[in-house]
Protein backbone atom coordinates (compact mmCIF):
# COMPACT_ATOMS: atom_id res chain seq x y z
CA UNK A 1 0.00 0.00 0.00
CA UNK A 2 1.40 3.35 -0.97
CA UNK A 3 2.02 6.21 1.46
CA UNK A 4 -0.65 8.34 -0.21
CA UNK A 5 -3.27 5.63 0.28
CA UNK A 6 -2.46 5.31 3.97
CA UNK A 7 -2.71 9.07 4.58
CA UNK A 8 -6.07 9.58 2.77
CA UNK A 9 -7.95 6.79 4.62
CA UNK A 10 -10.36 8.19 7.31
CA UNK A 11 -9.56 7.25 10.85
CA UNK A 12 -11.76 4.47 12.23
CA UNK A 13 -14.80 5.68 14.29
CA UNK A 14 -14.38 5.13 17.97
CA UNK A 15 -16.83 2.55 19.23
CA UNK A 16 -19.10 3.45 22.17
CA UNK A 17 -18.80 1.53 25.32
CA UNK A 18 -21.93 -0.25 26.57
CA UNK A 19 -22.43 2.36 29.28
CA UNK A 20 -22.17 5.22 26.80
CA UNK A 21 -24.65 3.51 24.44
CA UNK A 22 -27.06 2.87 27.27
CA UNK A 23 -26.85 6.48 28.47
CA UNK A 24 -27.49 7.83 24.96
CA UNK A 25 -30.48 5.54 24.57
CA UNK A 26 -31.95 6.74 27.88
CA UNK A 27 -31.52 10.39 26.86
CA UNK A 28 -33.23 9.74 23.52
CA UNK A 29 -36.08 7.95 25.29
CA UNK A 30 -36.50 10.79 27.80
CA UNK A 31 -36.59 13.35 24.98
CA UNK A 32 -39.24 11.39 23.09
CA UNK A 33 -41.38 11.04 26.21
CA UNK A 34 -41.03 14.76 26.87
CA UNK A 35 -42.23 15.57 23.37
CA UNK A 36 -45.12 13.11 23.71
CA UNK A 37 -46.24 14.54 27.07
CA UNK A 38 -45.99 18.11 25.77
CA UNK A 39 -48.18 17.15 22.82
CA UNK A 40 -50.70 15.53 25.16
CA UNK A 41 -50.78 18.66 27.32
CA UNK A 42 -51.44 20.83 24.26
CA UNK A 43 -54.30 18.57 23.16
CA UNK A 44 -55.81 18.61 26.66
CA UNK A 45 -55.57 22.42 26.78
CA UNK A 46 -57.32 22.74 23.42
CA UNK A 47 -60.06 20.31 24.43
CA UNK A 48 -60.55 22.02 27.79
CA UNK A 49 -60.79 25.45 26.17
CA UNK A 50 -63.28 24.12 23.65
CA UNK A 51 -65.42 22.54 26.35
CA UNK A 52 -65.38 25.71 28.46
CA UNK A 53 -66.40 27.75 25.39
CA UNK A 54 -69.13 25.28 24.45
CA UNK A 55 -70.68 24.73 27.90
CA UNK A 56 -72.51 28.08 28.21
CA UNK A 57 -73.78 27.76 24.65
CA UNK A 58 -75.13 24.27 25.30
CA UNK A 59 -76.66 25.50 28.55
CA UNK A 60 -78.31 28.36 26.69
CA UNK A 61 -79.78 25.97 24.13
CA UNK A 62 -81.08 23.61 26.81
CA UNK A 63 -82.42 26.38 29.05
CA UNK A 64 -84.10 28.27 26.19
CA UNK A 65 -84.28 32.07 25.77
CA UNK A 66 -84.11 34.30 28.82
CA UNK A 67 -87.48 35.04 30.35
CA UNK A 68 -88.18 38.76 30.80
CA UNK A 69 -90.27 39.27 33.92
CA UNK A 70 -91.54 42.56 35.31
CA UNK A 71 -90.84 43.45 38.93
CA UNK A 72 -93.75 43.72 41.34
CA UNK A 73 -94.93 47.24 42.20
CA UNK A 74 -97.62 47.69 44.84
CA UNK A 75 -98.06 51.47 44.42
CA UNK A 76 -98.41 52.08 48.15
CA UNK A 77 -96.25 55.20 48.10
CA UNK A 78 -97.44 56.52 44.75
CA UNK A 79 -98.63 60.13 44.71
CA UNK A 80 -100.55 61.39 41.69
CA UNK A 81 -99.67 64.91 40.54
CA UNK A 82 -102.27 66.31 38.17
CA UNK A 83 -99.87 69.12 37.22
CA UNK A 84 -97.13 66.72 36.07
CA UNK A 85 -96.44 67.71 32.45
CA UNK A 86 -95.28 64.18 31.70
CA UNK A 87 -98.88 63.03 32.20
CA UNK A 88 -100.28 65.50 29.67
CA UNK A 89 -103.06 63.88 27.67
CA UNK A 90 -103.27 64.56 23.96
CA UNK A 91 -106.06 62.93 21.96
CA UNK A 92 -109.09 63.74 19.82
CA UNK A 93 -110.99 64.92 22.90
CA UNK A 94 -108.03 66.88 24.30
CA UNK A 95 -106.22 68.46 21.33
CA UNK A 96 -103.40 70.96 21.67
CA UNK A 97 -104.46 74.47 22.58
CA UNK A 98 -101.04 75.68 21.41
CA UNK A 99 -98.20 74.02 19.55
CA UNK A 100 -95.75 72.50 22.09
CA UNK A 101 -92.10 73.55 22.17
CA UNK A 102 -90.33 70.86 24.23
CA UNK A 103 -86.63 70.99 25.07
CA UNK A 104 -85.26 68.20 22.90
CA UNK A 105 -82.26 65.90 22.93
CA UNK A 106 -81.16 63.06 20.67
CA UNK A 107 -82.45 59.75 21.98
CA UNK A 108 -81.18 57.39 19.26
CA UNK A 109 -77.91 58.29 17.55
CA UNK A 110 -78.44 55.70 14.81
CA UNK A 111 -81.77 57.12 13.64
CA UNK A 112 -81.26 60.71 14.82
CA UNK A 113 -84.66 60.72 16.50
CA UNK A 114 -85.20 63.20 19.33
CA UNK A 115 -87.33 63.15 22.46
CA UNK A 116 -87.94 65.62 25.27
CA UNK A 117 -84.62 65.88 27.13
CA UNK A 118 -85.53 63.78 30.19
CA UNK A 119 -87.29 61.20 28.04
CA UNK A 120 -84.27 61.04 25.71
CA UNK A 121 -81.90 60.36 28.61
CA UNK A 122 -84.16 57.60 29.93
CA UNK A 123 -84.56 56.11 26.47
CA UNK A 124 -80.78 55.86 26.03
CA UNK A 125 -80.50 54.07 29.38
CA UNK A 126 -83.34 51.75 28.42
CA UNK A 127 -81.85 50.92 25.02
CA UNK A 128 -78.48 50.14 26.63
CA UNK A 129 -80.14 47.83 29.17
CA UNK A 130 -82.06 46.07 26.41
CA UNK A 131 -78.86 45.64 24.40
CA UNK A 132 -77.22 44.00 27.42
CA UNK A 133 -80.06 41.46 27.33
CA UNK A 134 -79.52 40.81 23.63
CA UNK A 135 -82.37 43.04 22.45
CA UNK A 136 -81.78 45.89 19.98
CA UNK A 137 -84.33 48.70 20.11
CA UNK A 138 -84.79 51.12 17.21
CA UNK A 139 -86.45 54.48 17.79
CA UNK A 140 -88.14 55.13 14.46
CA UNK A 141 -90.17 58.19 15.50
CA UNK A 142 -89.90 60.62 18.38
CA UNK A 143 -90.73 64.32 18.39
CA UNK A 144 -92.59 65.52 15.30
CA UNK A 145 -93.50 69.08 14.38
CA UNK A 146 -97.02 70.05 13.26
CA UNK A 147 -96.27 69.74 9.54
CA UNK A 148 -94.86 66.24 9.93
CA UNK A 149 -97.82 65.13 12.03
CA UNK A 150 -100.35 66.57 9.58
CA UNK A 151 -98.60 64.99 6.59
CA UNK A 152 -98.73 61.59 8.29
CA UNK A 153 -102.43 62.00 9.00
CA UNK A 154 -103.26 63.08 5.44
CA UNK A 155 -101.29 60.15 4.02
CA UNK A 156 -103.34 57.79 6.17
CA UNK A 157 -106.59 59.40 5.06
CA UNK A 158 -105.52 58.98 1.44
CA UNK A 159 -105.04 55.23 1.90
CA UNK A 160 -108.72 54.98 2.82
CA UNK A 161 -109.77 57.24 -0.04
CA UNK A 162 -107.91 54.84 -2.32
CA UNK A 163 -110.11 52.07 -0.91
CA UNK A 164 -113.15 54.06 -2.03
CA UNK A 165 -114.17 55.16 1.45
CA UNK A 166 -116.16 58.36 1.79
CA UNK A 167 -114.28 61.45 2.98
CA UNK A 168 -115.95 61.22 6.37
CA UNK A 169 -115.27 57.50 6.72
CA UNK A 170 -111.67 57.89 5.55
CA UNK A 171 -111.03 60.59 8.17
CA UNK A 172 -112.68 58.53 10.91
CA UNK A 173 -110.71 55.37 10.14
CA UNK A 174 -107.43 57.26 9.75
CA UNK A 175 -107.85 58.89 13.16
CA UNK A 176 -107.96 55.47 14.87
CA UNK A 177 -104.41 54.82 13.65
CA UNK A 178 -102.84 58.17 12.83
CA UNK A 179 -104.35 61.11 14.74
CA UNK A 180 -104.64 64.54 13.18
CA UNK A 181 -101.81 66.96 13.96
CA UNK A 182 -103.57 68.62 16.89
CA UNK A 183 -104.39 65.24 18.49
CA UNK A 184 -101.04 63.55 17.91
CA UNK A 185 -98.89 63.33 21.06
CA UNK A 186 -95.65 63.12 19.07
CA UNK A 187 -95.63 66.91 19.39
CA UNK A 188 -94.96 66.63 23.14
CA UNK A 189 -91.62 64.91 22.67
CA UNK A 190 -92.80 62.17 25.04
CA UNK A 191 -94.08 59.72 22.40
CA UNK A 192 -91.71 57.07 21.06
CA UNK A 193 -92.33 54.63 18.23
CA UNK A 194 -90.00 51.72 18.95
CA UNK A 195 -89.26 48.75 16.69
CA UNK A 196 -86.54 46.12 16.30
CA UNK A 197 -84.43 44.73 13.47
CA UNK A 198 -86.50 41.53 13.28
CA UNK A 199 -89.72 43.55 12.86
CA UNK A 200 -89.00 46.96 11.33
CA UNK A 201 -92.62 47.61 10.36
CA UNK A 202 -95.22 49.46 12.42
CA UNK A 203 -97.70 46.61 12.63
CA UNK A 204 -99.08 44.25 15.27
CA UNK A 205 -96.41 41.71 14.37
CA UNK A 206 -94.10 43.68 16.67
CA UNK A 207 -96.10 42.23 19.59
CA UNK A 208 -94.58 38.82 18.78
CA UNK A 209 -90.97 39.99 19.09
CA UNK A 210 -88.44 39.68 21.91
CA UNK A 211 -88.15 43.48 21.85
CA UNK A 212 -91.84 43.88 22.70
CA UNK A 213 -91.53 41.20 25.40
CA UNK A 214 -88.60 43.10 26.90
CA UNK A 215 -90.40 46.45 26.76
CA UNK A 216 -93.51 45.00 28.36
CA UNK A 217 -91.40 43.73 31.25
CA UNK A 218 -88.95 46.60 31.76
CA UNK A 219 -89.96 49.81 29.95
CA UNK A 220 -91.82 51.12 33.02
CA UNK A 221 -88.59 50.98 35.01
CA UNK A 222 -87.30 53.69 32.66
CA UNK A 223 -90.54 55.69 32.66
CA UNK A 224 -92.23 54.38 29.49
CA UNK A 225 -95.69 52.84 29.12
CA UNK A 226 -97.49 51.17 26.24
CA UNK A 227 -99.65 54.06 25.11
CA UNK A 228 -102.33 52.22 23.14
CA UNK A 229 -102.84 48.79 24.75
CA UNK A 230 -104.88 45.99 23.29
CA UNK A 231 -108.62 46.11 24.08
CA UNK A 232 -108.42 49.75 25.20
CA UNK A 233 -109.56 51.49 22.02
CA UNK A 234 -112.81 52.60 23.66
CA UNK A 235 -110.75 54.69 26.09
CA UNK A 236 -107.86 55.81 23.88
CA UNK A 237 -109.61 56.12 20.52
CA UNK A 238 -106.63 54.37 18.93
CA UNK A 239 -106.23 50.74 17.88
CA UNK A 240 -103.60 48.49 19.50
CA UNK A 241 -100.14 49.84 18.64
CA UNK A 242 -97.43 47.68 20.23
CA UNK A 243 -94.71 49.98 18.88
CA UNK A 244 -96.06 53.21 20.41
CA UNK A 245 -94.63 53.98 23.86
CA UNK A 246 -95.05 57.09 25.97
CA UNK A 247 -92.71 58.61 28.55
CA UNK A 248 -94.51 59.53 31.79
CA UNK A 249 -91.70 59.26 34.37
CA UNK A 250 -90.67 56.18 36.33
CA UNK A 251 -93.10 56.38 39.28
CA UNK A 252 -96.04 57.17 37.01
CA UNK A 253 -95.09 54.38 34.61
CA UNK A 254 -94.79 51.77 37.36
CA UNK A 255 -98.17 52.76 38.78
CA UNK A 256 -99.86 52.74 35.37
CA UNK A 257 -98.40 49.36 34.45
CA UNK A 258 -99.53 47.90 37.78
CA UNK A 259 -103.05 49.23 37.21
CA UNK A 260 -103.41 47.57 33.81
CA UNK A 261 -105.19 50.70 32.56
CA UNK A 262 -104.59 53.01 29.63
CA UNK A 263 -103.26 56.50 30.32
CA UNK A 264 -106.75 57.97 29.86
CA UNK A 265 -108.31 55.51 32.30
CA UNK A 266 -105.54 55.87 34.86
CA UNK A 267 -105.73 59.67 34.95
CA UNK A 268 -109.53 59.60 35.16
CA UNK A 269 -109.35 57.17 38.07
CA UNK A 270 -106.75 59.24 39.93
CA UNK A 271 -108.71 62.46 39.48
CA UNK A 272 -111.85 60.76 40.76
CA UNK A 273 -110.17 59.79 44.06
Question: Each predicted region: which residue ranges?
Answer:
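Extracytoplasmic cell-surface/polysaccharide-interacting catalytic and binding patches
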Residues: 2-273
Amino acid sequence: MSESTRTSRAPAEKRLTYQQWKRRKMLRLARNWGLFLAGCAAVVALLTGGILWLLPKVHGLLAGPKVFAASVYDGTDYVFDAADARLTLVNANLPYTAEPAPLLDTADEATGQQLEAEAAMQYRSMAAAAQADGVSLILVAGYQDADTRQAAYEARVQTYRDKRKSEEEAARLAATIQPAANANEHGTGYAADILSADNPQQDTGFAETRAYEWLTAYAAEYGFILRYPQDRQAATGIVFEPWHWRYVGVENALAIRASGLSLEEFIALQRAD
